């Protein structure tokens, strides 16, 4: 069941102020006694803006004029999925007064105007969606590093571990970014890349965001590339503190030798890109390589979902067949298996060695592309929380790093889930000291 609500950011008489209300000290209420925003649950068929007007009347005793929509978030509340939007509003009649007389709905015991958004921090920490949406909207006015720092504070994270970032030889990176710029056949839509700086600046950017460990995922698009990419990856990891030594392979006779050499050199993660590579993961030429990876227990970040454009060997079927032959593989399903989310969740539920990364999931860019994560699958994703890892696709993303993190926050899966996804699960997987 889906329950929809609206919360109201009532602008105060002085610039930068807004109205906050305090909930009753009800011991059964997780938000008891905290300051938050006035909100109402929408009736069936009720328009959000009509809900804003009703919130003013029922909760504050005033007439409100709805303004702009600040944002939306959702949260699994067990018996229902809560979807909540924040709206700006101004008072056009009356003076605020609490509590109002309707005892059938939550009333408030105190109100005041506040200027500091931090007044809502405790409510956000206790799970208030309306407080979180407001704080996210407010944080977008900050420099990006401060936005990421604010996300980390809200989530209780000292640092972040990102298992899906890309570093590669500059010539290859330029070719990859040119393909994105041209919205090539495997992209399917315009894709304005956010981070185009030189290599050292990109590394420094991640560190400024508090990213303590990250990958340098490489992937060949034709035979004969993997060995040289792996040599570059080994060198990059050796000269870049915090980089998890990354390697790759292709469906070719040298695959097992390439994988074996990379493991001997200390590779800690591999990338397999079935869409770009265009090969079948069940090609017999790959069997020895998969066997080595399974025996070594090295994770393989695998782009196997059919997004943004399907390939000949994408989708859950080829991966299910691969796992039937190599059940010990540690596969990290990139992009949560987008758009076949449910099928890949099923594979993760069946195979304890299968993990998922969050790359691009939940962002407006993906939602607008027609591949949103189904809200009904959020409980399954929550239950797999110890096998979900943060991925971002930095630097080749068409929005900011902060946008990607805040999109995860909007899932409403909670701070424990966020901490596990953005740090703890990867720390365990890669044996990174806390």
Residue ranges of predicted features:
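Conserved, mostly hydrophobic/aromatic
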Residues: 164, 206, 233, 262, ...
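Mid-to-C-terminal alpha-helical segments outside catalytic/metal-binding sites
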Residues: 149-163, 173-209, 213, 384-387, ...
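Short, well-ordered coil/turn segments that N-cap beta-strands
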Residues: 156-159, 210-214, 239-245, 265-268, ...
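Active-site gating/metal-coordination segments in enzymes
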Residues: 212-213, 220-314, 363
């Amino acid at each position: 069941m889906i329950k929809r609500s609206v919360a109201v950011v009532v602008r105060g008489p002085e610039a930068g102020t807004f109205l906050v209300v305090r909930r009753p000290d009800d011991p059964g209420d997780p938000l008891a006694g905290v300051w938050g925003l006035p909100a109402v649950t929408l009736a069936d068929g009720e328009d959000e803006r009509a809900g804003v007007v009703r919130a003013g009347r029922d909760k504050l005793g005033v007439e409100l004029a709805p303004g702009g929509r600040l944002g939306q978030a959702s949260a699994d509340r067990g018996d229902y999925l809560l979807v909540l939007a924040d709206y700006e509003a101004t008072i056009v009649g009356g003076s605020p007064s609490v509590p109002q007389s309707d005892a059938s709905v939550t009333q408030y015991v105190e109100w005041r105007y506040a200027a500091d958004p931090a007044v809502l921090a405790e409510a956000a920490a206790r799970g208030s969606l309306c407080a979180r949406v407001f704080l996210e909207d407010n944080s977008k006015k900050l420099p990006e590093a401060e936005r990421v720092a604010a996300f980390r504070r809200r989530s209780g994270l000292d640092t972040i571990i990102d298992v899906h970032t890309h570093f590669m030889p500059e010539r290859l990176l330029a070719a990859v970014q040119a393909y994105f710029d041209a919205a090539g056949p495997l992209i399917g839509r315009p894709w304005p890349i956010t981070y185009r700086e030189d290599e050292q600046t990109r590394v420094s950017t991640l560190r400024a965001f508090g990213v303590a460990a990250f990958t340098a995922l490489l992937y060949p698009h034709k035979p004969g590339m993997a060995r040289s990419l792996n040599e570059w990856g080994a060198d990059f990891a050796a000269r870049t503190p915090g980089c998890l030594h990354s390697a790759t392979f292709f469906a070719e006779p040298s695959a097992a030798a390439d994988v074996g050499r990379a493991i001997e050199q200390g590779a800690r993660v591999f990338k397999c890109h079935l869409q770009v590579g265009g090969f079948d993961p069940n090609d017999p030429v790959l069997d020895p390589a998969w066997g080595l990876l399974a025996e070594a227990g090295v994770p393989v970040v695998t782009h196997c979902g059919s997004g943004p454009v399907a390939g000949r060997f994408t989708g859950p079927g080829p991966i299910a067949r691969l796992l039937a032959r190599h059940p010990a593989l540690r596969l990290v399903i990139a992009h949560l298996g987008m758009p076949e989310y449910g099928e890949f969740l099923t594979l993760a539920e069946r195979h304890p060695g299968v993990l998922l990364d969050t790359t691009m999931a939940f962002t407006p860019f993906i939602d607008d592309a027609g591949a949103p994560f189904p809200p009904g699958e959020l409980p399954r994703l929550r239950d797999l929380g110890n096998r979900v890892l943060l991925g971002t696709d930095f630097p080749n993303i068409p929005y900011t790093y902060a946008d990607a993190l805040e999109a995860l926050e909007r899932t409403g899966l909670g701070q424990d889930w966020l901490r596990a996804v953005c740090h703890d699960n990867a720390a365990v997987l890669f044996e990174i000291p806390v």
